Amino acid sequence: DERSVWQAPRVFSIDHWLRFCWDELQDQNHRLVSGLSVVGPQQSRYYWEKAIAKEDAEHSTSYAKIAGDTLKTLQNCNLSIDQVPDETPAVEFFKRWLHNFNELLERNHLITQQQSWQLIEQGFKCGALPQDSAILLYGFQSTPPLPATIINSASSSVNTLQTVTKSNDNTFRLETQDRHQELRLASSWAAQQLAIKPDQRIGIVVPDLNNCLHQVSRLVGEALKTQGTETVVNISAGTAMADTALVNAALGLIGILQHKRSLQEWLQLLYSPYCAFNQLSVQFRTDAELALRKTRRFDFTLEQFLSGIIPHQESEQREAALLILQPLIELKTFARLKTGSQKSFSGWAAFFNQFLEPMGWPGKRQLNSIEYQQRQHWNSLIEQFCSLDNLGIEVGLSTALKHLQQLARESVFHPPTADAPLQILGLLEGAGLRFDQLWIVGMHSQNFPASVAINPLL
Protein backbone atom coordinates (compact mmCIF):
# COMPACT_ATOMS: atom_id res chain seq x y z
CA ASP A 1 0.00 0.00 0.00
CA GLU A 2 1.89 3.04 -1.28
CA ARG A 3 0.90 6.26 0.34
CA SER A 4 2.26 9.72 -0.25
CA VAL A 5 1.98 12.96 1.68
CA TRP A 6 2.73 16.56 0.95
CA GLN A 7 6.01 17.77 2.36
CA ALA A 8 5.41 20.51 4.92
CA PRO A 9 5.90 23.90 3.22
CA ARG A 10 8.94 25.84 4.39
CA VAL A 11 7.16 29.02 5.48
CA PHE A 12 9.01 31.17 8.01
CA SER A 13 8.95 34.60 9.54
CA ILE A 14 12.31 36.29 8.93
CA ASP A 15 13.41 35.90 12.57
CA HIS A 16 12.33 32.25 12.67
CA TRP A 17 14.23 31.49 9.46
CA LEU A 18 17.43 33.16 10.70
CA ARG A 19 17.18 31.29 14.01
CA PHE A 20 16.70 28.03 12.06
CA CYS A 21 19.86 28.77 10.02
CA TRP A 22 21.86 29.59 13.16
CA ASP A 23 20.75 26.34 14.82
CA GLU A 24 21.82 24.45 11.69
CA LEU A 25 25.34 25.90 11.94
CA GLN A 26 25.45 25.11 15.66
CA ASP A 27 24.36 21.50 15.02
CA GLN A 28 27.25 21.17 12.56
CA ASN A 29 29.63 22.67 15.15
CA HIS A 30 30.94 24.62 12.17
CA ARG A 31 34.18 26.55 12.65
CA LEU A 32 32.28 29.81 12.00
CA VAL A 33 30.22 29.41 15.17
CA SER A 34 32.23 26.97 17.29
CA GLY A 35 32.27 28.05 20.94
CA LEU A 36 30.03 31.09 20.34
CA SER A 37 26.62 31.88 21.85
CA VAL A 38 24.15 34.67 21.10
CA VAL A 39 23.78 37.09 24.01
CA GLY A 40 20.21 37.30 25.34
CA PRO A 41 18.30 40.58 25.79
CA GLN A 42 18.71 40.69 29.58
CA GLN A 43 22.34 39.61 29.43
CA SER A 44 22.95 42.31 26.82
CA ARG A 45 21.36 44.95 29.07
CA TYR A 46 23.57 43.85 31.98
CA TYR A 47 26.75 44.06 29.86
CA TRP A 48 25.76 47.47 28.49
CA GLU A 49 25.22 48.77 32.04
CA LYS A 50 28.61 47.43 33.03
CA ALA A 51 30.27 48.90 29.91
CA ILE A 52 28.72 52.34 30.45
CA ALA A 53 29.44 52.30 34.20
CA LYS A 54 33.14 52.01 33.40
CA GLU A 55 32.93 55.49 31.83
CA ASP A 56 29.94 56.99 33.64
CA ALA A 57 28.49 55.03 36.58
CA GLU A 58 25.75 57.60 37.21
CA HIS A 59 23.96 57.04 33.88
CA SER A 60 24.68 53.36 33.22
CA THR A 61 21.07 52.24 33.73
CA SER A 62 19.37 55.05 31.82
CA TYR A 63 21.54 54.71 28.68
CA ALA A 64 21.83 50.91 28.48
CA LYS A 65 18.71 50.30 26.38
CA ILE A 66 19.31 53.12 23.92
CA ALA A 67 22.95 52.03 23.47
CA GLY A 68 21.78 48.49 22.67
CA ASP A 69 19.20 49.80 20.18
CA THR A 70 21.84 52.00 18.52
CA LEU A 71 24.21 49.07 17.98
CA LYS A 72 21.33 46.99 16.61
CA THR A 73 20.48 49.77 14.12
CA LEU A 74 24.10 50.07 12.94
CA GLN A 75 24.55 46.32 12.49
CA ASN A 76 21.20 45.95 10.69
CA CYS A 77 22.41 48.60 8.25
CA ASN A 78 25.75 46.78 7.73
CA LEU A 79 27.63 49.72 9.24
CA SER A 80 30.64 49.55 11.53
CA ILE A 81 31.22 52.08 14.28
CA ASP A 82 34.25 53.43 12.37
CA GLN A 83 31.90 54.58 9.60
CA VAL A 84 30.07 56.90 12.02
CA PRO A 85 31.72 60.35 12.04
CA ASP A 86 32.74 61.85 15.40
CA GLU A 87 30.58 64.94 14.96
CA THR A 88 28.99 65.05 18.41
CA PRO A 89 30.08 64.24 21.98
CA ALA A 90 27.29 61.61 22.10
CA VAL A 91 28.98 59.60 19.33
CA GLU A 92 32.31 59.75 21.16
CA PHE A 93 30.65 58.47 24.34
CA PHE A 94 28.93 55.68 22.42
CA LYS A 95 32.19 54.55 20.80
CA ARG A 96 33.86 54.23 24.21
CA TRP A 97 30.86 52.34 25.60
CA LEU A 98 30.85 50.02 22.59
CA HIS A 99 34.54 49.25 23.00
CA ASN A 100 33.90 48.18 26.62
CA PHE A 101 30.80 46.20 25.58
CA ASN A 102 32.68 44.31 22.86
CA GLU A 103 35.44 43.44 25.33
CA LEU A 104 32.87 41.95 27.72
CA LEU A 105 31.24 39.90 24.94
CA GLU A 106 34.59 38.64 23.66
CA ARG A 107 35.68 37.66 27.16
CA ASN A 108 32.52 35.56 27.57
CA HIS A 109 32.50 34.13 23.99
CA LEU A 110 29.25 35.91 23.14
CA ILE A 111 28.03 37.72 20.03
CA THR A 112 25.02 39.90 19.27
CA GLN A 113 22.07 38.61 17.29
CA GLN A 114 23.08 40.69 14.26
CA GLN A 115 26.62 39.28 14.40
CA SER A 116 25.11 35.78 14.32
CA TRP A 117 23.25 36.83 11.17
CA GLN A 118 26.53 37.97 9.60
CA LEU A 119 27.95 34.50 10.30
CA ILE A 120 24.85 32.96 8.67
CA GLU A 121 25.61 34.98 5.53
CA GLN A 122 29.16 33.58 5.55
CA GLY A 123 27.67 30.12 6.05
CA PHE A 124 25.72 30.41 2.81
CA LYS A 125 28.74 31.77 0.94
CA CYS A 126 31.08 28.98 2.04
CA GLY A 127 28.52 26.23 1.42
CA ALA A 128 27.95 25.26 5.07
CA LEU A 129 24.28 26.12 4.58
CA PRO A 130 22.52 24.84 1.43
CA GLN A 131 20.95 27.42 -0.86
CA ASP A 132 17.26 27.26 -1.76
CA SER A 133 16.26 27.07 -5.41
CA ALA A 134 13.86 29.99 -4.89
CA ILE A 135 12.73 32.29 -2.08
CA LEU A 136 9.39 34.12 -2.14
CA LEU A 137 8.92 37.16 0.11
CA TYR A 138 5.50 38.25 1.27
CA GLY A 139 4.39 41.10 3.51
CA PHE A 140 7.73 42.94 3.67
CA GLN A 141 7.23 46.72 3.59
CA SER A 142 10.96 47.32 3.95
CA THR A 143 13.89 45.04 4.73
CA PRO A 144 17.04 46.29 6.51
CA PRO A 145 20.27 45.81 4.49
CA LEU A 146 21.66 42.97 6.65
CA PRO A 147 18.64 40.60 6.39
CA ALA A 148 18.25 41.54 2.71
CA THR A 149 21.89 40.58 2.03
CA ILE A 150 21.43 37.23 3.79
CA ILE A 151 18.26 36.46 1.81
CA ASN A 152 20.05 37.23 -1.46
CA SER A 153 22.96 34.98 -0.46
CA ALA A 154 20.55 32.13 0.38
CA SER A 155 19.16 31.81 -3.16
CA SER A 156 19.84 32.96 -6.70
CA SER A 157 16.09 33.45 -7.23
CA VAL A 158 14.42 35.88 -4.80
CA ASN A 159 11.00 37.28 -5.70
CA THR A 160 8.46 39.40 -3.85
CA LEU A 161 4.77 38.49 -3.92
CA GLN A 162 2.63 41.57 -4.41
CA THR A 163 -0.78 41.86 -2.75
CA VAL A 164 -3.62 42.38 -5.22
CA THR A 165 -5.60 45.45 -4.25
CA LYS A 166 -8.95 46.58 -5.59
CA SER A 167 -10.13 50.15 -5.83
CA ASN A 168 -12.91 51.06 -3.42
CA ASP A 169 -15.50 53.67 -4.34
CA ASN A 170 -17.03 53.67 -0.86
CA THR A 171 -14.15 55.54 0.77
CA PHE A 172 -14.92 58.91 2.34
CA ARG A 173 -13.29 61.39 4.72
CA LEU A 174 -14.88 62.72 7.89
CA GLU A 175 -13.67 65.79 9.78
CA THR A 176 -14.24 66.04 13.53
CA GLN A 177 -13.63 68.71 16.14
CA ASP A 178 -11.00 66.78 18.03
CA ARG A 179 -9.49 63.36 18.57
CA HIS A 180 -11.83 62.36 21.40
CA GLN A 181 -14.88 63.05 19.25
CA GLU A 182 -13.49 60.94 16.41
CA LEU A 183 -12.79 57.99 18.71
CA ARG A 184 -16.32 58.24 20.10
CA LEU A 185 -17.83 58.42 16.59
CA ALA A 186 -15.73 55.47 15.38
CA SER A 187 -16.83 53.38 18.38
CA SER A 188 -20.51 54.25 17.88
CA TRP A 189 -20.29 53.54 14.14
CA ALA A 190 -18.72 50.11 14.73
CA ALA A 191 -21.36 49.21 17.34
CA GLN A 192 -24.19 50.28 14.99
CA GLN A 193 -22.78 48.29 12.06
CA LEU A 194 -22.40 45.16 14.20
CA ALA A 195 -25.96 45.56 15.47
CA ILE A 196 -27.17 45.59 11.85
CA LYS A 197 -24.95 42.72 10.66
CA PRO A 198 -23.18 40.81 13.48
CA ASP A 199 -21.20 38.43 11.25
CA GLN A 200 -19.18 41.10 9.42
CA ARG A 201 -15.53 41.94 10.18
CA ILE A 202 -14.89 45.55 11.20
CA GLY A 203 -11.57 47.22 11.92
CA ILE A 204 -10.67 50.47 13.67
CA VAL A 205 -7.03 51.50 13.14
CA VAL A 206 -5.61 53.91 15.74
CA PRO A 207 -2.02 55.03 14.92
CA ASP A 208 -1.00 55.64 18.56
CA LEU A 209 -3.13 52.95 20.16
CA ASN A 210 -0.65 52.29 22.98
CA ASN A 211 -1.01 55.89 24.19
CA CYS A 212 -4.82 55.81 24.38
CA LEU A 213 -5.54 52.16 25.12
CA HIS A 214 -7.76 52.71 28.17
CA GLN A 215 -9.70 55.53 26.50
CA VAL A 216 -10.42 53.44 23.39
CA SER A 217 -11.39 50.41 25.47
CA ARG A 218 -13.83 52.51 27.52
CA LEU A 219 -15.43 54.22 24.50
CA VAL A 220 -15.89 50.94 22.60
CA GLY A 221 -17.41 49.30 25.69
CA GLU A 222 -19.84 52.21 26.16
CA ALA A 223 -20.86 52.16 22.48
CA LEU A 224 -21.53 48.40 22.43
CA LYS A 225 -23.56 48.68 25.65
CA THR A 226 -25.61 51.56 24.22
CA GLN A 227 -26.44 49.51 21.11
CA GLY A 228 -27.14 46.40 23.19
CA THR A 229 -24.54 44.51 21.15
CA GLU A 230 -22.70 41.61 22.75
CA THR A 231 -19.62 40.80 20.70
CA VAL A 232 -15.98 39.86 21.21
CA VAL A 233 -13.55 42.76 20.75
CA ASN A 234 -9.85 42.26 20.09
CA ILE A 235 -7.63 45.20 21.05
CA SER A 236 -4.15 44.47 19.70
CA ALA A 237 -2.18 46.74 22.04
CA GLY A 238 -0.72 44.98 25.05
CA THR A 239 -0.01 46.11 28.60
CA ALA A 240 3.36 46.03 30.33
CA MET A 241 3.44 43.07 32.72
CA ALA A 242 4.42 45.43 35.55
CA ASP A 243 1.12 47.29 35.04
CA THR A 244 -1.13 44.22 35.21
CA ALA A 245 -2.95 43.85 38.52
CA LEU A 246 -1.61 40.43 39.52
CA VAL A 247 2.06 41.05 38.67
CA ASN A 248 1.98 44.57 40.11
CA ALA A 249 0.77 43.08 43.41
CA ALA A 250 3.56 40.46 43.37
CA LEU A 251 6.23 43.12 42.76
CA GLY A 252 4.69 45.28 45.48
CA LEU A 253 4.83 42.43 47.99
CA ILE A 254 8.45 41.62 47.12
CA GLY A 255 9.20 45.33 47.53
CA ILE A 256 8.33 44.95 51.23
CA LEU A 257 11.76 43.35 51.62
CA GLN A 258 13.41 46.69 50.85
CA HIS A 259 14.17 49.06 53.71
CA LYS A 260 11.35 51.59 53.21
CA ARG A 261 8.22 51.90 51.09
CA SER A 262 6.14 55.00 50.45
CA LEU A 263 2.74 55.44 52.12
CA GLN A 264 1.03 55.12 48.73
CA GLU A 265 2.72 51.77 48.06
CA TRP A 266 1.68 50.43 51.48
CA LEU A 267 -1.92 51.55 50.96
CA GLN A 268 -1.99 49.95 47.52
CA LEU A 269 -1.04 46.63 49.13
CA LEU A 270 -3.45 47.14 52.03
CA TYR A 271 -6.42 47.28 49.63
CA SER A 272 -5.10 44.74 47.10
CA PRO A 273 -7.34 41.67 46.49
CA TYR A 274 -4.25 39.60 45.61
CA CYS A 275 -2.67 39.12 49.05
CA ALA A 276 -3.42 38.31 52.69
CA PHE A 277 -4.49 41.91 53.41
CA ASN A 278 -7.72 41.16 51.53
CA GLN A 279 -8.77 38.85 54.39
CA LEU A 280 -8.85 41.82 56.79
CA SER A 281 -12.21 43.51 57.31
CA VAL A 282 -12.93 46.71 55.40
CA GLN A 283 -13.33 48.56 58.71
CA PHE A 284 -9.90 47.38 59.91
CA ARG A 285 -8.23 48.51 56.68
CA THR A 286 -9.97 51.89 56.84
CA ASP A 287 -8.84 52.38 60.46
CA ALA A 288 -5.33 51.27 59.47
CA GLU A 289 -5.16 53.85 56.68
CA LEU A 290 -6.29 56.63 59.03
CA ALA A 291 -3.72 55.55 61.62
CA LEU A 292 -0.93 55.59 59.02
CA ARG A 293 -1.94 59.04 57.75
CA LYS A 294 -2.01 60.39 61.33
CA THR A 295 1.70 59.65 61.68
CA ARG A 296 2.38 62.21 58.91
CA ARG A 297 5.15 59.99 57.56
CA PHE A 298 5.89 59.80 53.85
CA ASP A 299 7.42 56.32 54.03
CA PHE A 300 7.50 53.36 56.40
CA THR A 301 9.70 50.40 57.18
CA LEU A 302 7.94 47.07 57.69
CA GLU A 303 8.14 47.46 61.49
CA GLN A 304 6.76 51.01 61.37
CA PHE A 305 3.92 49.88 59.11
CA LEU A 306 2.92 46.99 61.40
CA SER A 307 3.20 49.19 64.49
CA GLY A 308 0.90 51.72 62.83
CA ILE A 309 -1.89 49.36 61.75
CA ILE A 310 -2.10 46.81 64.63
CA PRO A 311 -4.35 48.07 67.48
CA HIS A 312 -2.54 48.25 70.83
CA GLN A 313 -5.59 47.41 72.97
CA GLU A 314 -6.69 43.80 73.32
CA SER A 315 -9.83 43.06 71.29
CA GLU A 316 -11.35 40.40 69.06
CA GLN A 317 -10.52 42.56 66.03
CA ARG A 318 -6.86 42.71 67.11
CA GLU A 319 -6.64 38.93 67.58
CA ALA A 320 -8.22 38.29 64.16
CA ALA A 321 -5.83 40.77 62.52
CA LEU A 322 -2.78 39.25 64.23
CA LEU A 323 -3.73 35.83 62.91
CA ILE A 324 -3.92 37.12 59.33
CA LEU A 325 -0.81 39.31 59.63
CA GLN A 326 1.31 36.63 61.34
CA PRO A 327 3.37 35.84 58.18
CA LEU A 328 4.14 39.56 57.87
CA ILE A 329 5.11 39.80 61.56
CA GLU A 330 7.42 36.79 61.22
CA LEU A 331 8.88 38.38 58.09
CA LYS A 332 10.77 40.94 60.19
CA THR A 333 13.20 38.26 61.35
CA PHE A 334 13.00 36.28 58.11
CA ALA A 335 13.89 39.32 56.00
CA ARG A 336 16.92 40.21 58.10
CA LEU A 337 18.24 36.67 57.86
CA LYS A 338 17.63 36.10 54.16
CA THR A 339 17.92 39.39 52.25
CA GLY A 340 21.44 40.37 53.25
CA SER A 341 23.10 37.56 51.31
CA GLN A 342 24.23 37.25 47.69
CA LYS A 343 22.46 34.70 45.50
CA SER A 344 22.27 33.54 41.90
CA PHE A 345 19.24 34.75 39.95
CA SER A 346 17.58 31.33 40.19
CA GLY A 347 18.29 31.44 43.94
CA TRP A 348 16.45 34.76 44.18
CA ALA A 349 13.59 33.39 42.05
CA ALA A 350 13.13 30.50 44.51
CA PHE A 351 13.33 32.98 47.40
CA PHE A 352 10.66 35.25 45.86
CA ASN A 353 8.29 32.33 45.29
CA GLN A 354 8.93 31.08 48.83
CA PHE A 355 8.15 34.58 50.13
CA LEU A 356 4.96 35.15 48.09
CA GLU A 357 3.23 31.96 49.22
CA PRO A 358 2.73 32.87 52.92
CA MET A 359 1.87 36.43 51.86
CA GLY A 360 -1.30 35.02 50.29
CA TRP A 361 -0.45 35.89 46.67
CA PRO A 362 -2.36 35.70 44.33
CA GLY A 363 -5.31 35.65 46.78
CA LYS A 364 -7.79 33.11 48.12
CA ARG A 365 -10.52 33.46 45.49
CA GLN A 366 -10.48 31.61 42.17
CA LEU A 367 -8.72 33.57 39.43
CA ASN A 368 -10.70 34.66 36.39
CA SER A 369 -9.47 34.00 32.85
CA ILE A 370 -7.41 37.21 32.53
CA GLU A 371 -5.86 36.79 35.99
CA TYR A 372 -5.00 33.16 35.27
CA GLN A 373 -3.18 34.22 32.09
CA GLN A 374 -1.32 36.89 34.07
CA ARG A 375 -0.26 34.18 36.55
CA GLN A 376 1.07 32.06 33.65
CA HIS A 377 2.95 35.07 32.28
CA TRP A 378 4.46 35.61 35.74
CA ASN A 379 5.80 32.06 35.66
CA SER A 380 7.36 32.77 32.24
CA LEU A 381 8.80 36.00 33.62
CA ILE A 382 10.47 34.09 36.45
CA GLU A 383 11.93 31.64 33.91
CA GLN A 384 13.43 34.55 31.94
CA PHE A 385 14.77 35.96 35.20
CA CYS A 386 16.46 32.61 35.98
CA SER A 387 18.14 32.67 32.54
CA LEU A 388 20.34 35.48 33.87
CA ASP A 389 22.27 32.73 35.66
CA ASN A 390 24.24 32.57 32.39
CA LEU A 391 26.04 35.69 33.60
CA GLY A 392 27.72 33.51 36.23
CA ILE A 393 27.38 36.07 39.03
CA GLU A 394 25.67 36.39 42.40
CA VAL A 395 23.81 39.58 43.30
CA GLY A 396 22.09 41.21 46.26
CA LEU A 397 18.37 41.80 46.74
CA SER A 398 18.27 45.31 45.24
CA THR A 399 20.03 44.22 42.03
CA ALA A 400 17.85 41.11 41.69
CA LEU A 401 14.67 43.12 42.21
CA LYS A 402 15.85 45.76 39.73
CA HIS A 403 16.28 43.13 37.00
CA LEU A 404 12.92 41.52 37.81
CA GLN A 405 11.12 44.88 37.64
CA GLN A 406 12.93 45.71 34.41
CA LEU A 407 11.80 42.42 32.86
CA ALA A 408 8.22 43.08 33.97
CA ARG A 409 8.25 46.57 32.42
CA GLU A 410 9.59 45.30 29.10
CA SER A 411 7.40 42.17 28.82
CA VAL A 412 4.02 42.78 27.19
CA PHE A 413 0.84 41.06 28.36
CA HIS A 414 -1.74 40.55 25.64
CA PRO A 415 -4.48 38.06 26.54
CA PRO A 416 -5.21 35.77 23.56
CA THR A 417 -8.70 36.15 22.11
CA ALA A 418 -10.61 34.36 19.39
CA ASP A 419 -10.99 35.99 15.96
CA ALA A 420 -13.33 38.85 16.86
CA PRO A 421 -15.84 40.70 14.64
CA LEU A 422 -14.41 44.01 15.91
CA GLN A 423 -10.63 44.53 15.72
CA ILE A 424 -8.95 47.59 17.30
CA LEU A 425 -5.45 47.80 15.82
CA GLY A 426 -2.36 49.93 15.53
CA LEU A 427 -0.91 50.82 12.12
CA LEU A 428 1.59 47.96 11.98
CA GLU A 429 -0.91 45.34 13.19
CA GLY A 430 -3.49 46.45 10.63
CA ALA A 431 -1.16 46.25 7.62
CA GLY A 432 -2.16 43.50 5.19
CA LEU A 433 -5.44 42.58 6.93
CA ARG A 434 -8.81 42.63 5.19
CA PHE A 435 -12.08 43.90 6.63
CA ASP A 436 -15.65 44.33 5.45
CA GLN A 437 -15.51 47.88 6.83
CA LEU A 438 -12.59 49.91 8.14
CA TRP A 439 -12.20 53.23 10.01
CA ILE A 440 -8.71 54.78 10.16
CA VAL A 441 -8.46 57.31 12.97
CA GLY A 442 -6.39 60.48 12.70
CA MET A 443 -5.63 60.60 8.97
CA HIS A 444 -3.76 63.89 9.02
CA SER A 445 -0.25 65.09 8.21
CA GLN A 446 1.05 64.54 11.75
CA ASN A 447 0.35 60.80 11.53
CA PHE A 448 0.79 60.08 7.80
CA PRO A 449 3.51 59.47 6.92
CA ALA A 450 4.75 58.48 10.36
CA SER A 451 7.53 60.69 11.71
CA VAL A 452 11.05 59.28 11.85
CA ALA A 453 12.43 58.55 15.32
CA ILE A 454 15.78 60.32 15.76
CA ASN A 455 18.48 58.37 17.57
CA PRO A 456 19.97 60.71 20.22
CA LEU A 457 23.35 58.95 20.15
CA LEU A 458 23.79 59.25 16.37
Regions found by a protein language model. Name each.
Residues 1-458:
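Polyanion-engaging groove/track-forming segments
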